[in-house]
Design a protein with these regions (language model features):
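Alpha-helical scaffolding within the catalytic cores
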Residues: 42-44, 66-76, 104-108, 170-174, ...
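N-terminal module-boundary/linker segments of secreted carbohydrate-active enzymes
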Residues: 27-90, 95, 99-100, 351-363
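Substrate-binding cleft of extracellular glycoside hydrolase catalytic domains
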Residues: 94-222, 226
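Substrate-binding cleft of secreted/luminal carbohydrate-active enzymes
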Residues: 56-61, 281-363
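Aromatic- and acid-rich polysaccharide-binding/catalytic face
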Residues: 87, 245-266, 308-309
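Bacterial N-terminal signal peptides that target proteins for export
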Residues: 2-13
């Protein structure tokens, strides 16, 4: 047996032992910010914490109406399925209408991907609460709220707050389907909030973008009881119109993971700032354009996953670059036993506890 395979199996065995109840391992696992988090959500967070510093899960984003198109392309390019499957509740390019009609099919694809062994992460390019869907992406998602509208949005009982609740409640219904199917989700709310290109972003301070993040956390956790969510806080790499990251942090009691989007240069200062702000929580590259090299991953070992943005896997990277990171020893693809064994353990534990069997399918 090759040395690489032996090393992979040894690490998989140690991670599985932890998932099955190793006391020492459990003591080092972070407590979810939601005290009522499901066993699956807790296990997923504990797994990500366990690989921090040792390995990184490969990931790929997909547009709502694309199913698993870009995940399948990553496989075609590298021969490996990404370990993390990313989807979106609302993203359309240019003047196309928002992809709200794709949500039911997207949820079914998420279930299939999880059953086949992938970690699931979901993003939401939410339209302004002043707008009714469907609308165009540029007009609404990249629109603007006045300061007065922003204050109304954060004030319970106002017409704009009520509209926002109605909008959020629709997406909560889809997330509830995943909760009831025992699918844990890395949920990335109001991403890139330190940037000025989305209506929710570019507002630093306690009453700014972070306050809206806390508001959706409260509604999803305390009203809808979406206890399958692992809460992912996210910023863009600082520079240009993206402000200092600490000005947007909602507080450690609202974030299970601390993540950054980097589309070009993986500066060491970005990594260091995330490690410091996370204060022991797992960190990740929630979006990348250009893939990190194996050398970058060795120098920045605490990233727990990366997610390439849809077509960028091909348009911003050469075939050699994609294969270099997907076949790096540190990288965990879907079939890697260091990922596949723990994910199977989580699904089997669900079946044992609830009688609900989450099994793989022929769909990729």
């Amino acid at each position: 047996m090759q040395v690489k395979t032996i090393r992979m199996l040894r690490l998989a065995a140690s991670v599985l032992a932890g998932l099955l109840g190793c006391a020492a391992w459990a003591q080092t696992a972070p407590e979810p910010v939601n005290p009522n988090a499901t066993p699956e959500a807790r296990a997923l967070l504990a797994y990500l914490n366990s690989i921090s510093g040792n390995a990184i899960v490969t990931g790929q984003h997909n547009y709502p109406n694309d199913g698993a198109r870009w995940t399948n392309l990553a496989h075609d390019l590298t021969g490996k399925y990404p370990g993390l499957f990313g989807q979106d509740f609302g993203f359309s390019a240019g003047d196309d209408k928002d992809s709200v009609l794709s949500r039911p099919a997207m949820i079914e694809e998420v279930k299939r991907q999880y059953a086949n062994g992938a970690i699931v992460t979901l993003t939401w390019h939410e339209v302004r609460p002043t707008d009714d869907e469907p609308v165009t992406f540029h007009e609404s998602v990249q629109g603007h709220l006045t300061d007065s509208e922003w204050q109304q949005l954060l004030t319970p009982g106002t017409p704009l707050y009520i509209r926002w609740c109605s909008q959020v409640d629709v997406v909560a219904g889809y997330l509830r389907q995943l909760r009831d199917a025992h699918v844990p989700v890395l949920f990335r709310a109001y991403h890139e909030m330190n940037g000025s290109w989305f209506w929710w972003g570019g507002r630093p301070g306690k009453d700014g973008s972070a306050a809206l993040y806390r508001q959706i956390y409260d509604r999803f956790v305390n009203v809808h009881h979406l206890d399958n969510l692992v809460w992912v806080w996210n910023v863009n790499a600082p520079g240009g119109s993206a402000g200092p990251i600490a000005d947007y942090y909602p507080g450690p009691q609202y974030a299970d993971l601390v993540t950054m989007d980097i589309y070009s240069e993986f500066k060491q200062q970005f990594y260091t700032s995330m490690v410091e702000l996370a204060a022991g929580k797992p960190i990740a590259l929630a979006e990348v354009g250009k893939l990190p090299t194996p050398e970058v991953l060795e120098q920045q070992p605490r990233w727990t996953y990366f997610m390439t943005w849809s077509e960028w896997i091909q348009t911003a990277n050469t075939l050699d670059q994609a294969n270099a990171v997907y076949h790096a020893l540190r990288s965990l693809n879907r079939d890697d036993p260091r990922l596949a064994v723990p994910m199977e353990a989580i699904r089997k534990a669900t079946a044992s506890r609830t009688g609900v069997r989450v099994s793989g399918s022929n769909s990729q």
